Amino acid sequence: RMLGVAPIGCSVVAHQFMNVDMCEAAHGRAPAVASGIRRVHPDKVVFTYQGDGDLASIGMGEIVHAAARGEKFTTFFINNGIYGMTGGQMAPTTLIGQRSTTSVDGGFGPRWILSSSSSSRSNRHCVKY
C-alpha cells in the first residue's frame, strides 16, 4: 500500500530503516519519480525522503513543479544544513553563522526558507520541527 522514493545522497540508505517498498532516484529527481509512481498507482501512498542538498539545491525545480501541478505524494525533507555525504560543505540551507567545511566562519548571505515557500493550493500540510 505504501511506496517510497529515496534519491542518491544522505537518504540513499533509507530503505534499510523502513519496512516499505522503496526505489532509488537520481540526485534531486525523487519528486519526478514519485509523481510517475503515483500516477501509475493512484491507490498507493507515495512519499519521498530527501535531504536538503538533494531537495533544496539539486532538486529544487522538481519539487516546485510537482507542487505547482498538485502532485499527490508526501515529502519528508531532512534538513541537516550541509551536504553530508560529500564532506559537510555549505548547502542552501546552512544557517547564517553555522560552520561547515566550506564556510569555516559560518554560513553567510540571505537564506531562503523552503518551508515558508510551500504554500501552494495543493499543499495540505507543512511542518517545521
Q: Can you annotate each of these PLM segments?
A:
Residues 40-43, 91-129:
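Conserved thiamine diphosphate
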Residues 87-89:
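Short aromatic-enriched loop/helix-cap "lid" or pocket-rim segments at secondary-structure transitions
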Residues 2-7:
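A short beta-strand-loop structural module common to alpha/beta enzyme folds
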Residues 8-84:
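Thiamine diphosphate
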Residues 1, 59-62, 110, 114:
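General structural feature for long, well-ordered alpha-helical segments within catalytic domains
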